[in-house]
Amino acid sequence: MKRFLLACLLVVAIATPAEAQTCVVNDPTGTPLNVRTSPNGAILGALYNGAVVQVLKVIFDKRGRSWALVVPLEPGKQGWVFGAFLTCGR
């Protein structure tokens, strides 16, 4: 019975979609954070400190730096931003 319950929990955990994490732009330089087509790709736009975004995906480049695919909660373009300039909490 315990194995059955454990198997059921595992199926539910795998089948449940991950929630997008909400984060805030926090660039210590005070300059706008570039929103890009891909990690370190062409610039699509910019986000200012305090902008709230939803993180859809995080990847790491060859140098181990994080890049986040974000969607701004205010009107704006979905794109990739440098992850070090996001403050996220649960």
Residue ranges and their predicted role:
Residues 37-43:
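Short alpha-helix capping/helix-loop boundary micro-motifs
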Residues 4-14:
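Sec-dependent N-terminal signal peptides
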